[in-house]
Amino acid sequence: MAKKQKKSTEKSERTVEFKEPPKPANSEERLKPAGRGMKPSPSQNTLNRMERETIVFWRRPHIVIPYALMEIAHLAVELFFKILAHKTVLLLTAISIGLAVYGYHAPGAHQEHVQTIEKHILWWSWWVLLGVLSSIGLGSGLHTFLIYLGPHIAAVTMAAYECQSLDFPQPPYPESIQCPSTKSSIAVTFWQIVAKVRVESLLWGAGTALGELPPYFMARAARISGQEPDDEEYREFLELMNADKESDADQKLSIVERAKSWVEHNIHRLGFPGILLFASIPNPLFDLAGITCGHFLVPFWSFFGATLIGKALVKMHVQMGFVILAFSDHHAENFVKILEKIPAVGPYIRQPISDLLEKQRKALHKTPGEHSEQSTSYLAWGLSLMVTFMILFFFLSIVNSLAKDYHKRLWERKRRQNKDLIDEENQSFEEEEEEAVTPPSSCPLLLSDGFEGVVVKK
């Protein structure tokens, strides 16, 4: 008996050990799942946005052109009905336009003043429009300072030192510049040139401030409503904000992106002085000024006042001064001499630029009836071609933007129709359920008053 008890205790003390198979070298703690795994399905809004990004002229011109024309027609109809909704304003505007047209065409001594006012209004409106286009860009990145305002300031500066005067004959100034017949006895100074081009520069700067208003109102409305608008710059702004909150943001973001994120996070705390500071300095850290201030619900006058003062007054005087100093007396020739010292390509760069400057000087001294030289250098031809391509690309960006807006309009209309259809189906389904309620007489046993229960016998 003792032997049997001993054997039974030995059997009961036996344990089973499970050994794991040896892991291969450089293996992870967890095995990778087999198969492709599960991927999240994009929403209809995401698919719609991805499709809209493909609607560009160089990919789908047969869709872009009709969509752009339809969007223009829709905008015209909407504007017409909005004008009709304000009948008093419409009546006063029509009367004012009628009086202005009558005064414009009526003969009299006032015609001289009318022509002067018209000339100034068109000239000033042109620079404001260029500033707005430079700020908005519509996705093209068009910076009209490099195309129009910068060359205008440079031409006035070079003409001032060449002619030794700023009293350019009008006309043809400001369309073209010619030296006056008599030279001034007073030397041309830096501040005189600044005063000559100040109006155009300030109007251009005011236009850039006005161009920040649409993104400001868009971002402000999106923040208040909680809906994300279909805007590429706003999505870029939100991605930068969300990426900065992650734990490994310092590794993912570059130094410029981290600096831009810091500015956009703290601009609403700095308020008017901070917005004025960043709007006054030409820097890439504040390129989304309207979106940033609108997203953080900065008050309108704090945003627009600081942006207007910073861009139109401070920043424009900085850019003006830089261009005037760069193209002032003999600085252009010194720059050409520096270019000539570049190995291999220096002499080839110097000659076209020297020819262009010499041709510009000769054009300044021609008389109004004199025939000018029509030959064009390769450098001038290349610059004209570059400007033409930039303007053409800007025009195509406007067409693409209109086509995308019409595609979004179609999507919104389709979504509203689907929502109305679903609401109608749900309503009809609820009505059918109410009609299909079972009457009490269809089940007399369970619903009768004398029914007390069921007795189950074993």
Swiss-Prot record:
Keywords: Autophagy, Cytoplasm, Membrane, Transmembrane, Transmembrane helix. GO terms for biological process: autophagosome assembly; Golgi organization; macroautophagy; negative regulation of autophagosome assembly. Residues 1-45, 421-445 are annotated as: Disordered. It comes from Caenorhabditis elegans. Its main location: membrane. Belongs to the VMP1 family. It comes from the Eukaryota. This is Ectopic P granules protein 3. Expressed in pharyngeal and body wall muscles and intestine cells. The gene is epg-3. Residues 7-32 have a biased composition (Basic and acidic residues). Involved in autophagy. Thought to act in autophagosome and omegasome formation. Residues 422-436 have a biased composition (Acidic residues). GO terms for cellular component: cytoplasm; endomembrane system; endoplasmic reticulum; membrane. The chain crosses the membrane at residues 89-109, 121-141, 289-309, 379-399. It is a multi-pass membrane protein. It is found in: Membrane; Cytoplasm. Disruption phenotype: Defective P granule organization and degradation. Early autophagic structures and lgg-1 puncta form an irregular shape and clump together. RNAi-mediated knockdown results in increased lgg-2-positive autophagosomes following fertilization and at later embryonic stages.
